[in-house]
Amino acid sequence: THLAGPDKPPGWSYNPSSWIRRWLGIALAVLGFFLSRYLAAHQLGYIPHLWDPFFGDGSDRVTCSALSKSFPISDAGFGAVAYVLEVLIGFMGSRARWRTAPFIVVSFVLLVLPLGATSILLVIMQPVVVGAWCGFCLINAAALLISVPLAVHESIAVGQFLRLAYKQKKKFWSFFWLGGSALGYEGKDPDRTRWSIRQRWAASYQGISLPWFIVLQAIVGVWLMARPNILPYNIASADCDHWMGAIVVTVAAVATAEVTRTARFVNIIAGVIVLILALLFSSGSTAVLMSGIASAVLLILVSIPKGVIVERYASWDRFIK
């Protein structure tokens, strides 16, 4: 039949479109919706003040800043709508939607990635432009960073499927919109009805790992973002650390997915930039200078290891360096 075929992509050790792989991303989108809804209620004047779990009146200052008001609509409200779409798309399609409905997967990825990039950009601009932090904005950004490695696996599977269709001289756009079969391959999703809670939890983030060197990259990034508040020096140095810290954390989050583990090399470049910026803007403060040098060297060193790749991704294996 037109859509006959396996659940797992050919050559993969698991199914990135299975329901157990989707629930975590959907749950994070639901969390993002309620947080964005709360922030939007303040921006639109429905509640007078925001409660911030970490930064006092920081959320009030950020949501009412000139930066937020520069958007033609409530940025938090727009984010809430995007999260609703993310939840709806997360529920769409069968457990083999990587081949039965590729356009759904592509739509999901195109929604998650720009939303994540925008969220990170706004987080960077909070201390740089506004001079304050928004606690719920940071929680939202963290949830999005977790969603990105969860979503990227399906996009790889879709890309491989469409490439196979193209090589077989089949109608590309027909396969993109209507899906297709993968006859000749086998791979059914396992029956998880008797699985323990621990087994189900492990299956929900299959293909994602948190090796020690990725953890250290994230710690360096968080330190760079927090350094201006702990070791204040000058505005130029603080702005550089805010920008570089957010970039380092973002790259580390993307690299937690085995299919995008190669992204960690970007943090080697980031480490070199941190070193140069420390020498340029922190030379008047020994503590800030040493912090920049130590952060840069550590970041470069921990961005080299690849770690153990547990799963298999067919032709994509050769791109995991």
Per-region residue spans from a language model:
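A structural feature that tracks compact, well-ordered secondary-structure segments
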Residues: R227-L231, A252, R264, G271, ...
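Hydrophobic alpha-helical membrane segments
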Residues: F108-S119, F265-L279
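Membrane-interfacial helix-loop segments of redox and metal-homeostasis proteins
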Residues: T1-M244, V248-R261, S291, L298-L299, ...
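Terminal recognition/anchoring or ligand-binding modules at protein termini
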Residues: F281-K321
